[in-house]
Amino acid sequence: MEVNDKFFAQDDIFWENYLKGRPRVPDSFFDRIFDYHKAKGGHFGTVHDVGAGNGPYALRLRSRFDHVIVSDIVANNIELARRRLQGEEGFSFRTSRLQDADDIAAGSVDMVFATNVMHFADPQDIAMAAIAHQLRPGALFRQGGRQLLNKANDPTETARVMLRTQGTRGIQSMLPLDDVHQTTPEPNYTGPDDAEIYEDDEGWSFETDLAGVKEHFESFPFVSQFPGAFTEMYRELDDLLADGKPVQGYFPVKVILATRS
């Protein structure tokens, strides 16, 4: 397995499961981003959807921007995005790592939209430099298991990716405790003038059943590679959620909004 560039190298069946298993993003999510961008005097010319997969959010971005660049590290994902957006105007497509942006003119992008992708970029400083290169002044940057380590061809890099997903307030890290020694914590870049806001948004709550829980698990690319690792957990879920018992919860979301000076 390649470390980062093959995690989401999946077929259209996976992406169908992905769209079913991941949260239905509420309008409030995009409204917050667009309102912030407008309040900062940003233009709505070009937005770059990086790590876009098969482009599930591209049309929503196009509803406000004149042009959407859809890019992903996996060529097949970009082909799936082309099919998904066939006949639509205002889109261009590129296959590239997030860190590689030399083909994009400096200062030509009004917003970089990075959803569930920044933790894969390594090294992080090169990724941020690539984002800064393409953003015009006043433009917006929006970022919102052990078996995996054993199969990765660079466990140290994969450990850094997993550590960057470590959450707070009860969110469990993906990195096994006895593998933390492989890497060091990422630095905290929160500055004294940055605002951290915690709030509840009902749009991220959900109620589902056993089938819905399994759809969510199957939206992660490594689940299908290690079916045996989930056998016992699925057996427990079958007992807990028998007879259509509902599951209620919410998806925790962290959004970073930053304007290029």
UniProtKB/Swiss-Prot annotation:
CDD domains: AdoMet_MTases. It comes from the Eukaryota. Its EC number is 2.1.1.-. It holds the Pfam family Methyltransf_11. The keyword NADP does not apply. Disruption phenotype: Impairs the production of neosartorin but accumulates no metabolites related to the neosartorin pathway. Coiled coil: none annotated. InterPro entries: Diverse_substrate_MTase, Methyltransf_11, SAM-dependent_MTases_sf. Transmembrane segments: none annotated. The keyword Transferase applies. Residues 49-141 are annotated as: Methyltransferase domain. GO terms for biological process: methylation. One of its GO terms (molecular function) is S-adenosylmethionine-dependent methyltransferase activity. Pathway: Secondary metabolite biosynthesis. Keywords: Methyltransferase, S-adenosyl-L-methionine, Transferase. Methyltransferase; part of the gene cluster that mediates the biosynthesis of the tetrahydroxanthone dimer neosartorin, which exhibits antibacterial activity. The two different monomeric units appear to be synthesized by the same set of enzymes, among which the Baeyer-Villiger monooxygenase nsrF is the key enzyme for the divergence of the biosynthetic routes. The pathway begins with the synthesis of atrochrysone thioester by the polyketide synthase nsrB. The atrochrysone carboxyl ACP thioesterase nsrC then breaks the thioester bond and releases the atrochrysone carboxylic acid from AacuL. Belongs to the methyltransferase superfamily. This is Methyltransferase nsrG. It comes from Aspergillus novofumigatus (strain IBT 16806). The lineage of its organism: Eukaryota, Fungi, Dikarya, Ascomycota, Pezizomycotina.
